[in-house]
Amino acid sequence: MGSDTLDQPIFAIGTIIEDLEIIQTLSISINGQVYLAKDINTFQLYAIKSLRHIDSASLHQNFQLNEILLHSRLSGHPHVIRIERVIQNSDWTHIVIEYGSEGDLFTAIVDNNIYYGNHSLIRHVFLQLIETVRFCHSKGIYHRDLKPENILVFDRGHTLKLADFGLATADCYSKDYGCGSTFYFSPECQGGFLIDSQMGYATAPNDVWSLGVILINLSTGRNPWHIASLEDKTYCAFLRDPDLLLKMLPISSELNRIIKRIFCLDPLKRITLDELYLRVQHCIHFTRTEEVTQYESMVLKAVQLKNAQVYSKSTDDLPTPPDTPDITYSPCINQGSSSSFMGTGLLQKVALFPKMEKEI
């Protein structure tokens, strides 16, 4: 076994742990290390998630034990990453899990562009996610960190499997405010909205909110805002005008109606998973097809003209300004037209919305 410091790999390539040979280091972070391993008998590939025992009495250690326990209760579901076994020693716990060779949903959306404009595929995989989260909730488990990085892709993007239960809880209500990822957690999870000081926030509606952001990711490749907070100007603009996303992104009216039900500020009135499943099942178009085609054409022309002054930066990477402009007074919003996405300022409108990026 190699170094045992937090920022160095604990396994050298070629190390064998039980009957698994380490063949690649996949990631190293403060939360743990992930390796690719091969069974020396069957040649089957697995991922090994290694968690350091920092302090047996610490909150961190409790989260580790909780992750294994809750994930194990869900492991048999076809859309949950399977736990094969758990290997423990005095300093580390190694969770051997199913390996997804196609990577995560973030990569599929951002790098491989699998879903953009593909209505049937978006519907197919998002229904899988709803059904999987519904299964988790039926078992009394709430993920609290739903995001594309925690969803693995199989079958060339047609099958999704939920992973990483490190922040999951069995509590229907939680006072762990700020638990999750800023792009994806709900307003009430931040402790800034509708706080019940006795109970905390409801964890099931918080998961539903995260699913809504993922649905925007799948449909547009963008995040709707940096954080659902009054400090975020884009989110504040959405609170003032619930049709903002329809006017600024190439989403369909059908999707807009669903999104408004998901992003209901009151978690008790937020759409349920059962209703969400039915609405998505009957949603024909997630984006406005003609406008998407025109948008792609404009992006192509922008790339070809990237040396011109107006396209001084390649629009392959539509930048989000450091400070999002006050959208309320932006002249590019046509309050009277649901199709105001198109026309002058199209690229600038899309650029107002945060690019998808991984949170460390």
Residue spans for each PLM region:
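Activation segment signature within eukaryotic-like protein kinase domains
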Residues: 125-126
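Glycine-rich ATP phosphate-binding loop
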Residues: 33-38, 43-53
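Short beta-strand micro-motifs within the conserved protein kinase catalytic domain, predominantly
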Residues: 82-91
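Catalytic-loop of the protein kinase fold
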Residues: 137-154
